[in-house]
Amino acid sequence: MKTYIVIFTTLILLISCEKEDFNEGNIRIDKELIMQLNSKSYDTLIIESNKLVLDAYLWRDFMPISPPDGKTMISINWLRDIDSTEILDNIGLIEQYVIYNDSIWIAEYENETSTTQPDYKIKKRSREGPKWGPNICVDVISKICDSNSNNDYYIKIKDIYVERTD
């Protein structure tokens, strides 16, 4: 009987423990990582002759061909020079972090290039995100690489509304 009580108590304790770092695919619950990302990211970033900001558009598709609970999130990010100066070739968008409460969607950008963007913008897309929202606000942080210096930088934009497309 004592064995059952010990096993039962142990199970209860394990189940009730708070999970600080939960991973599900590319979605994490990690308050510490969110604090680290926020502490090293900037609203405006200056790299050589470029003064850069991040723009973002996120949505979930609820078109009739979509599942009843909608498709996963899609994100488009633009790195933009605020003076419309051509962005140097050594600067690139590498990875994005979409933050909602204590959860983070971490995604590398798709390997597509846009020929329709002006020289002062870089456009990158990520798919297969979480099914958060729609009609919520998230923060977006992007990891940028400067291949000349081999330095990574982080740039952010806050309170981006996640749209619903029908």
Regions found by a protein language model. Give the residues of each.
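Surface-exposed edge beta-strand/loop patches
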Residues: 20-44, 125-166
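A general beta-strand register signal
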Residues: 46, 99-100
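C-terminal motif of bacterial Sec signal peptides marking the signal peptidase cleavage site
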Residues: 13-16
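Short, solvent-exposed, Trp/other aromatic-anchored flexible loops in extracytoplasmic proteins
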Residues: 82-86, 102-151
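Residue-level recognition of well-ordered beta-strand positions that form the cores
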Residues: 76-80, 97, 141-143
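Sec-dependent signal peptide recognition
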Residues: 2-8
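Short flexible loop/turn segments that cap and initiate beta-strands
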Residues: 88-94
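Contiguous beta-strand segments within globular domains
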Residues: 51-82, 88
